[in-house]
Protein backbone atom coordinates (compact mmCIF):
# COMPACT_ATOMS: atom_id res chain seq x y z
CA UNK A 1 0.00 0.00 0.00
CA UNK A 2 1.43 3.48 -0.89
CA UNK A 3 2.65 5.50 2.10
CA UNK A 4 0.00 8.22 1.83
CA UNK A 5 -2.76 5.62 1.53
CA UNK A 6 -1.42 3.95 4.67
CA UNK A 7 -1.43 7.31 6.42
CA UNK A 8 -4.99 7.94 5.26
CA UNK A 9 -6.05 4.51 6.51
CA UNK A 10 -4.53 5.36 9.89
CA UNK A 11 -6.47 8.60 9.97
CA UNK A 12 -9.62 6.70 9.05
CA UNK A 13 -9.14 4.40 12.00
CA UNK A 14 -8.58 7.39 14.25
CA UNK A 15 -11.70 9.03 12.85
CA UNK A 16 -13.74 5.95 13.68
CA UNK A 17 -12.44 6.13 17.26
CA UNK A 18 -13.32 9.79 17.47
CA UNK A 19 -16.74 9.12 15.94
CA UNK A 20 -17.60 6.75 18.76
CA UNK A 21 -16.86 9.51 21.24
CA UNK A 22 -18.48 12.39 19.39
CA UNK A 23 -21.35 11.89 16.98
CA UNK A 24 -20.49 15.15 15.20
CA UNK A 25 -17.09 13.92 14.01
CA UNK A 26 -17.01 12.83 10.37
CA UNK A 27 -15.32 9.72 9.03
CA UNK A 28 -13.23 10.39 5.92
CA UNK A 29 -12.47 7.41 3.66
CA UNK A 30 -8.95 6.60 2.52
CA UNK A 31 -8.27 7.91 -0.97
CA UNK A 32 -5.36 8.75 -3.30
CA UNK A 33 -3.76 12.20 -3.00
CA UNK A 34 -2.68 13.25 -6.50
CA UNK A 35 -0.08 15.91 -7.22
CA UNK A 36 -1.70 18.86 -9.04
CA UNK A 37 -0.64 19.29 -12.65
CA UNK A 38 -1.00 23.08 -12.76
CA UNK A 39 1.87 23.95 -10.42
CA UNK A 40 5.54 24.26 -11.29
CA UNK A 41 7.69 21.17 -11.69
CA UNK A 42 9.73 22.28 -8.69
CA UNK A 43 6.68 22.50 -6.46
CA UNK A 44 5.37 19.20 -7.88
CA UNK A 45 8.59 17.54 -6.71
CA UNK A 46 8.10 18.92 -3.19
CA UNK A 47 4.41 18.01 -3.11
CA UNK A 48 5.11 14.41 -4.15
CA UNK A 49 7.51 13.74 -1.28
CA UNK A 50 6.19 11.56 1.56
CA UNK A 51 6.25 12.90 5.12
CA UNK A 52 9.55 12.24 6.93
CA UNK A 53 9.49 8.80 8.54
CA UNK A 54 10.74 10.30 11.81
CA UNK A 55 8.32 13.23 11.85
CA UNK A 56 7.00 12.36 15.31
CA UNK A 57 10.40 11.83 16.92
CA UNK A 58 11.97 14.60 18.96
CA UNK A 59 14.66 14.88 21.64
CA UNK A 60 13.76 14.26 25.25
CA UNK A 61 16.79 15.95 26.83
CA UNK A 62 18.32 19.42 26.59
CA UNK A 63 21.47 17.85 25.16
CA UNK A 64 19.40 16.14 22.49
CA UNK A 65 17.73 19.40 21.52
CA UNK A 66 21.11 21.13 21.33
CA UNK A 67 22.48 18.40 19.05
CA UNK A 68 19.42 18.66 16.79
CA UNK A 69 19.90 22.41 16.75
CA UNK A 70 23.55 22.18 15.70
CA UNK A 71 22.74 19.74 12.91
CA UNK A 72 19.94 21.98 11.61
CA UNK A 73 22.16 25.06 11.72
CA UNK A 74 24.95 23.35 9.80
CA UNK A 75 22.59 22.18 7.07
CA UNK A 76 20.74 25.50 6.90
CA UNK A 77 23.97 27.46 6.72
CA UNK A 78 25.06 25.51 3.63
CA UNK A 79 21.68 26.23 2.04
CA UNK A 80 21.91 29.94 2.87
CA UNK A 81 25.46 30.34 1.53
CA UNK A 82 24.60 28.63 -1.75
CA UNK A 83 21.37 30.60 -2.10
CA UNK A 84 23.06 33.95 -1.44
CA UNK A 85 25.67 33.15 -4.09
CA UNK A 86 23.06 32.18 -6.70
CA UNK A 87 20.92 35.23 -6.02
CA UNK A 88 23.80 37.74 -5.74
CA UNK A 89 23.07 38.74 -2.16
CA UNK A 90 25.71 39.66 0.42
CA UNK A 91 25.33 38.60 4.06
CA UNK A 92 27.27 40.40 6.79
CA UNK A 93 27.12 39.50 10.51
CA UNK A 94 26.70 42.38 12.95
CA UNK A 95 25.10 43.23 16.31
CA UNK A 96 22.01 45.36 16.94
CA UNK A 97 20.60 46.00 20.39
CA UNK A 98 23.02 43.46 21.82
CA UNK A 99 21.59 40.76 19.52
CA UNK A 100 23.42 38.96 16.74
CA UNK A 101 21.91 39.78 13.34
CA UNK A 102 22.85 39.52 9.67
CA UNK A 103 22.73 42.45 7.27
CA UNK A 104 21.40 41.04 4.00
CA UNK A 105 21.88 43.26 0.95
CA UNK A 106 20.86 42.59 -2.68
CA UNK A 107 23.10 43.59 -5.55
CA UNK A 108 20.18 45.51 -7.06
CA UNK A 109 18.65 47.48 -4.19
CA UNK A 110 15.63 49.33 -5.58
CA UNK A 111 16.05 53.13 -5.58
CA UNK A 112 12.73 53.49 -3.74
CA UNK A 113 14.08 51.24 -0.97
CA UNK A 114 17.34 53.07 -0.24
CA UNK A 115 16.03 54.47 3.05
CA UNK A 116 13.77 51.53 3.87
CA UNK A 117 14.64 48.54 6.03
CA UNK A 118 13.01 45.17 6.64
CA UNK A 119 13.51 43.06 9.76
CA UNK A 120 13.13 39.29 9.37
CA UNK A 121 12.41 36.79 12.16
CA UNK A 122 13.38 33.25 11.21
CA UNK A 123 11.33 30.06 11.27
CA UNK A 124 12.28 26.83 13.05
CA UNK A 125 9.64 26.10 15.70
CA UNK A 126 11.55 28.33 18.17
CA UNK A 127 14.50 25.93 18.42
CA UNK A 128 15.95 25.49 14.90
CA UNK A 129 17.23 27.68 12.08
CA UNK A 130 19.73 29.83 13.98
CA UNK A 131 23.12 31.13 12.93
CA UNK A 132 23.59 31.89 9.26
CA UNK A 133 20.69 29.52 8.54
CA UNK A 134 18.46 32.31 9.88
CA UNK A 135 19.11 34.32 6.72
CA UNK A 136 17.33 32.11 4.15
CA UNK A 137 14.05 34.05 4.14
CA UNK A 138 15.91 37.36 4.26
CA UNK A 139 17.98 36.33 1.22
CA UNK A 140 14.84 35.49 -0.74
CA UNK A 141 13.24 38.83 0.14
CA UNK A 142 16.40 40.77 -0.66
CA UNK A 143 16.75 39.05 -4.04
CA UNK A 144 13.12 39.10 -5.18
CA UNK A 145 11.91 42.19 -3.32
CA UNK A 146 15.09 44.30 -3.74
CA UNK A 147 15.15 45.38 -0.11
CA UNK A 148 17.86 45.53 2.52
CA UNK A 149 16.94 43.06 5.25
CA UNK A 150 18.16 42.50 8.80
CA UNK A 151 17.84 38.82 9.81
CA UNK A 152 17.50 38.43 13.58
CA UNK A 153 19.42 35.48 15.06
CA UNK A 154 17.43 35.39 18.29
CA UNK A 155 18.32 33.22 21.28
CA UNK A 156 16.77 29.77 21.49
CA UNK A 157 16.51 26.96 24.04
CA UNK A 158 18.25 25.19 25.62
CA UNK A 159 20.48 28.29 25.90
CA UNK A 160 17.51 30.60 26.61
CA UNK A 161 13.77 30.05 26.98
CA UNK A 162 10.63 32.17 26.62
CA UNK A 163 10.60 35.16 26.45
CA UNK A 164 14.27 35.46 25.38
CA UNK A 165 13.52 35.26 21.64
CA UNK A 166 10.82 37.89 21.97
CA UNK A 167 13.13 40.14 23.99
CA UNK A 168 15.73 39.90 21.22
CA UNK A 169 13.28 40.79 18.45
CA UNK A 170 12.07 43.84 20.38
CA UNK A 171 15.65 44.90 21.17
CA UNK A 172 16.60 44.84 17.46
CA UNK A 173 13.43 46.75 16.56
CA UNK A 174 14.23 49.46 19.10
CA UNK A 175 17.79 49.72 17.77
CA UNK A 176 16.54 49.99 14.18
CA UNK A 177 14.37 52.94 15.22
CA UNK A 178 17.53 54.96 15.96
CA UNK A 179 18.35 55.23 12.24
CA UNK A 180 15.00 54.76 10.49
CA UNK A 181 11.48 56.09 10.75
CA UNK A 182 9.03 53.35 11.78
CA UNK A 183 7.01 54.10 8.66
CA UNK A 184 10.06 53.18 6.55
CA UNK A 185 10.33 49.70 8.07
CA UNK A 186 8.44 46.40 8.02
CA UNK A 187 8.85 43.21 10.01
CA UNK A 188 8.23 39.78 8.56
CA UNK A 189 8.79 36.11 9.25
CA UNK A 190 7.45 32.62 8.78
CA UNK A 191 6.00 30.09 11.21
CA UNK A 192 7.49 30.75 14.67
CA UNK A 193 9.08 33.85 13.17
CA UNK A 194 5.65 35.22 12.22
CA UNK A 195 4.34 34.54 15.72
CA UNK A 196 7.35 36.31 17.23
CA UNK A 197 6.83 39.28 14.92
CA UNK A 198 3.23 39.58 16.14
CA UNK A 199 4.21 39.16 19.78
CA UNK A 200 6.83 41.87 19.28
CA UNK A 201 4.04 44.21 18.15
CA UNK A 202 2.16 43.57 21.41
CA UNK A 203 5.27 44.15 23.50
CA UNK A 204 6.28 47.31 21.61
CA UNK A 205 2.76 48.73 21.83
CA UNK A 206 2.63 48.05 25.58
CA UNK A 207 5.96 49.86 25.98
CA UNK A 208 4.86 52.84 23.90
CA UNK A 209 7.34 52.03 21.14
CA UNK A 210 6.26 52.95 17.58
CA UNK A 211 5.18 50.08 15.31
CA UNK A 212 6.45 49.43 11.76
CA UNK A 213 4.63 50.43 8.63
CA UNK A 214 3.72 46.86 7.65
CA UNK A 215 3.94 43.19 8.63
CA UNK A 216 4.53 40.01 6.63
CA UNK A 217 3.19 36.89 8.35
CA UNK A 218 4.00 33.59 6.65
CA UNK A 219 2.14 30.48 7.85
CA UNK A 220 2.12 31.86 11.40
CA UNK A 221 2.26 29.63 14.47
CA UNK A 222 -0.52 31.87 15.79
CA UNK A 223 -2.23 29.29 18.01
CA UNK A 224 -0.42 26.66 20.09
CA UNK A 225 -3.62 25.50 21.80
CA UNK A 226 -4.63 23.15 18.97
CA UNK A 227 -7.65 25.10 17.74
CA UNK A 228 -8.05 25.12 13.95
CA UNK A 229 -9.71 22.95 11.31
CA UNK A 230 -6.58 22.28 9.27
CA UNK A 231 -4.88 20.57 12.22
CA UNK A 232 -7.29 17.72 11.34
CA UNK A 233 -7.98 18.21 7.63
CA UNK A 234 -4.33 18.61 6.63
CA UNK A 235 -2.87 16.10 9.09
CA UNK A 236 -0.66 13.66 7.14
CA UNK A 237 -1.33 15.81 4.04
CA UNK A 238 1.23 18.46 4.99
CA UNK A 239 4.56 16.73 4.32
CA UNK A 240 6.59 19.26 6.33
CA UNK A 241 4.92 19.65 9.73
CA UNK A 242 2.81 16.53 9.09
CA UNK A 243 0.58 16.69 12.19
CA UNK A 244 0.30 18.06 15.71
CA UNK A 245 2.10 14.89 16.79
CA UNK A 246 5.08 16.08 14.75
CA UNK A 247 8.23 17.88 15.84
CA UNK A 248 7.10 21.49 15.83
CA UNK A 249 4.59 21.61 18.66
CA UNK A 250 6.85 19.84 21.19
CA UNK A 251 9.62 22.22 20.13
CA UNK A 252 7.38 25.23 20.78
CA UNK A 253 6.43 23.85 24.19
CA UNK A 254 10.12 23.32 24.93
CA UNK A 255 10.61 27.03 24.23
CA UNK A 256 7.56 27.92 26.37
CA UNK A 257 9.20 26.06 29.28
CA UNK A 258 5.96 25.49 31.20
CA UNK A 259 4.42 28.88 30.38
CA UNK A 260 0.74 28.89 29.40
CA UNK A 261 0.71 28.47 25.61
CA UNK A 262 -2.58 30.40 25.41
CA UNK A 263 -0.66 33.56 26.39
CA UNK A 264 -0.88 35.96 23.41
CA UNK A 265 2.91 36.24 23.47
CA UNK A 266 2.95 32.55 22.46
CA UNK A 267 -0.43 32.29 20.71
CA UNK A 268 -0.85 35.81 19.32
CA UNK A 269 -4.23 35.06 17.77
CA UNK A 270 -5.60 35.62 21.29
CA UNK A 271 -4.03 39.07 21.60
CA UNK A 272 -5.51 42.50 20.97
CA UNK A 273 -4.97 42.96 17.24
CA UNK A 274 -6.54 46.40 16.97
CA UNK A 275 -4.18 49.10 15.76
CA UNK A 276 -1.59 46.75 14.29
CA UNK A 277 0.13 47.70 10.99
CA UNK A 278 -1.20 46.48 7.63
CA UNK A 279 -0.32 42.81 7.21
CA UNK A 280 0.03 40.30 4.40
CA UNK A 281 -0.40 36.63 5.32
CA UNK A 282 0.82 33.64 3.29
CA UNK A 283 -0.07 29.94 3.40
CA UNK A 284 -0.78 26.93 1.18
CA UNK A 285 -3.74 24.62 0.71
CA UNK A 286 -1.87 21.69 2.33
CA UNK A 287 -0.33 23.69 5.17
CA UNK A 288 -1.08 22.26 8.61
CA UNK A 289 -1.27 25.90 9.75
CA UNK A 290 -3.66 27.01 7.01
CA UNK A 291 -6.45 27.49 9.56
CA UNK A 292 -4.15 29.43 11.86
CA UNK A 293 -3.36 31.73 8.95
CA UNK A 294 -6.99 32.07 7.82
CA UNK A 295 -8.30 32.61 11.37
CA UNK A 296 -5.64 35.23 12.05
CA UNK A 297 -6.48 37.00 8.80
CA UNK A 298 -10.16 37.14 9.74
CA UNK A 299 -9.41 38.37 13.26
CA UNK A 300 -7.14 41.08 11.88
CA UNK A 301 -9.90 42.20 9.52
CA UNK A 302 -12.47 42.10 12.31
CA UNK A 303 -10.12 44.28 14.38
CA UNK A 304 -9.98 46.90 11.65
CA UNK A 305 -6.50 45.98 10.38
CA UNK A 306 -5.76 46.16 6.65
CA UNK A 307 -4.91 42.49 6.03
CA UNK A 308 -4.28 40.61 2.76
CA UNK A 309 -4.23 36.81 2.42
CA UNK A 310 -2.42 34.81 -0.25
CA UNK A 311 -2.81 31.02 -0.38
CA UNK A 312 -0.81 28.89 -2.81
CA UNK A 313 -2.03 25.71 -4.43
CA UNK A 314 -0.80 22.44 -2.89
CA UNK A 315 1.92 24.02 -0.73
CA UNK A 316 2.64 22.39 2.61
CA UNK A 317 4.03 24.43 5.47
CA UNK A 318 6.38 27.20 4.29
CA UNK A 319 7.54 25.32 1.19
CA UNK A 320 8.18 28.66 -0.48
CA UNK A 321 11.40 28.71 1.56
CA UNK A 322 12.62 25.39 0.17
CA UNK A 323 13.56 26.17 -3.45
CA UNK A 324 14.58 29.61 -4.74
CA UNK A 325 14.22 28.41 -8.37
CA UNK A 326 10.45 27.78 -8.08
CA UNK A 327 8.29 30.46 -9.71
CA UNK A 328 5.95 30.18 -6.73
CA UNK A 329 8.78 31.26 -4.42
CA UNK A 330 9.46 34.35 -6.48
CA UNK A 331 5.74 35.12 -6.59
CA UNK A 332 5.40 34.83 -2.80
CA UNK A 333 8.13 37.37 -2.16
CA UNK A 334 7.19 39.70 -5.00
CA UNK A 335 3.66 39.86 -3.57
CA UNK A 336 4.98 40.63 -0.09
CA UNK A 337 7.43 43.21 -1.44
CA UNK A 338 4.65 44.88 -3.44
CA UNK A 339 2.50 45.03 -0.29
CA UNK A 340 5.37 46.61 1.63
CA UNK A 341 5.97 49.11 -1.17
CA UNK A 342 2.35 50.28 -0.92
CA UNK A 343 2.49 50.77 2.83
CA UNK A 344 6.02 52.00 3.63
CA UNK A 345 7.08 55.61 3.33
CA UNK A 346 10.17 56.45 1.28
Where are these regions (language model features)?
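Short, basic/low-complexity N-terminal boundary segments at the transition from targeting/disordered tails
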Residues: 63-78
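Intrinsically disordered/low-complexity terminal segments and short unstructured peptides
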Residues: 9, 60, 76-78, 89
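Bacterial N-terminal signal peptides
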Residues: 9-19
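Bacterial N-terminal signal peptides that target proteins for export
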Residues: 1-9
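Conserved, well-structured beta-alpha core segment at the onset of a catalytic domain
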Residues: 5, 17, 197
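Short linear motifs in intrinsically disordered
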Residues: 79-85
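Alpha/beta-hydrolase superfamily serine-hydrolase fold, recognizing
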Residues: 24-65, 85-346
Amino acid sequence: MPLLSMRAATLLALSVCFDSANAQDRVVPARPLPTPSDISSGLQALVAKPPPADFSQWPNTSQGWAERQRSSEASGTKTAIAMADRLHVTVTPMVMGGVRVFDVMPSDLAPANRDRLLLQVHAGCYVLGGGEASTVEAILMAAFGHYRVIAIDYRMPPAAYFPAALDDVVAVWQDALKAHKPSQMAMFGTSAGAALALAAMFRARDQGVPLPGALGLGAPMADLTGVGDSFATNAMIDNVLVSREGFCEPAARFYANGHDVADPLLSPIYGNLAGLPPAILTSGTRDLLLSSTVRLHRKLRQSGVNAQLQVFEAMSHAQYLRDDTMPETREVFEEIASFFDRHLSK
